[in-house]
Amino acid sequence: MSVSFDSSAFLATCSGRPGVYRMFDADARLLYVGKAKNLKKRLSSYFRKTGQAPKTAALVARIAQVETTITANETEALLLEQTLIKEWRPPYNILLRDDKSYPYVFLSDGEFPRLGIHRGAKKAKGRYFGPYPSALAIRESLSLLQKTFLVRQCEDSYYRNRTRPCLQYQIKRCKGPCVGLVSPEEYAEDVRHSVMFLEGRSNALSEELSASMEKASMALEFERAAELRDQISMLRRVQDQQSMEGGSGDVDVVAVMLNPGGACVHLISVRGGRVLGSKNFFPQVAIEEEGGEVLMAFLAQYYLGNAERDLPSELIVNVQHEDFSTLIEAVESLRGRSLSISLRVRGTRARWQQLAVTNAEQALAARLANRQHLAERFEALATVLEMDEPPQRMECFDISHSSGEATVASCVVFGPEGPLKSDYRRFNIEGVTPGDDYAAMHQALTRRFSKIKDGEGKLPDVLLVDGGKGQLAMAREVLQELAVPDLILLGVAKGTTRKPGLEVLYLNDAEHEFTLPGNSPALHLIQQIRDESHRFAITGHRARRGKARRTSTLEEVAGIGPKRRRELLNHFGGLQELSRASAEEIAKAPGISKKLAELIYATLHSE
């Protein structure tokens, strides 16, 4: 129990009403946020002398201050709790890591609408279908629709400026509305069929297509009948694959599985009776957490923490929790929608539930197996580096450029559980001699570790740099300039043969040079982190270089500023399409005179 916190005095004045409590440490850092029907009763349970779970004991040992907020009822307390958790992400709360919005299929307005992927606020005019649990699930649906009904998926800026059909028309993935190869009536029918599929009305769609096929055959329109036959065949294959499809309504099936090594929540999204896909979540939990607590924390954060998230009419779960009724009331209060939570289900819903449980079990087993493998690599590296315990945080820096152009430095971060992608950083390098990797590394490290000097950010246990003695010396110089506390420096050079497995390693002062066997788990970890840093740097460099090259040619044209360049590229759908346009076509763009259009055309086509 904390020696700096007088729990008896605090509890003597604590209210017995519903509310939210916040626990802080001696440095005023928020440790935990909780809610209670009876604040005094709930908080008293933390300060019992016996029977505390390890996680609770560790929390209580750090408490220096507790603050409470009284609310009108439990529902209000739950809503406030979720707001505070989302804002502060306290370390002792069960946290939902992946809270980004799910993608939707978007169907735009207009005579020839397009299908595409959409995330975020629904501001554009059109229809939204979903949400889909992953980008992969939505791409599968869009691919099927493109093959079956040939509705366009190109951006409007690209569509408006076509003068001949693109490759999608040639491979029978589009009917060419951009150049008038399909009538508005025929295209509208394809769009209507796509909507029926997205709404989950596959059976009705198949029946309608079958009737149309028979009608076309009777009219001796055999080409049209064959087209309809292919569409029906494609739909039936989907229905055969979608063995879980059945029933109606919008349902999310959520199952939680626990293991001493972690937890997994598996979510299956069903809309209109059709399973759209599924996704795994791995919340951080203590060993003693119960399934109901983990599930309740997940559901509250998932459905109350994002007002834009699509809400089903029913949740099917695999464990019970006493606060489900409070969650239902909170959802109705916040979202204005009714919600039911079911545990005992039959038929199709029971199959969905069992599948969610099975998927959660398998995903957790696979994650734990991978984590164990990674832990062995960390332990092996600790042995090689003569550390008392495995490193908890490793950072690796790499530089990428093309002959000095668009130089980007990457910083990737790994912990015992794998890559910490939310901590990844890229640095656009400016003001150095093109191609000077040492100066680029100096700038990147200075920008990164200046935050440590200013009291921000986390200090790694091991710092890797992709390079030999020179890069390692540069890293040492930066750390000394910034007076960064001691940490282990490791340089990774490719060796004379530049083959994987034959890397030369340099430790700290670069005087200690060594190699590791090709089958060394420690070397495999170093390679994994180095390769990830290389990948992250290259993707950043390519994006920066591509952006620069798209605009660099136009920068040579007098009278074209950044805003007009951007508008011009958006109008034509990119520099490539702009280059194909005639001077007359360029002059039709907003804000472009005939004289300026001729100048742009001449610049783009000069040798």
Swiss-Prot record:
Establish whether keyword GTP-binding is in the entry: no
Subunit text: Interacts with UvrB in an incision complex.
Which SMART domains does the entry link to?
GIYc (SM00465), HhH1 (SM00278)
HAMAP family this protein is in? UvrC
Protein name in UniProt: UvrABC system protein C
What organism is listed for this UniProt entry? Ectopseudomonas mendocina (strain ymp)
Q: Which InterPro entries match?
A: GIY-YIG_endonuc (IPR000305), GIY-YIG_endonuc_sf (IPR035901), GIY-YIG_UvrC_Cho (IPR047296), Hlx-hairpin-Hlx_DNA-bd_motif (IPR003583), RuvA_2-like (IPR010994), UVR_dom (IPR001943), UVR_dom_sf (IPR036876), UvrABC_protein_C (IPR050066)
Role description = The UvrABC repair system catalyzes the recognition and processing of DNA lesions. UvrC both incises the 5' and 3' sides of the lesion. The N-terminal half is responsible for the 3' incision and the C-terminal half is responsible for the 5' incision.
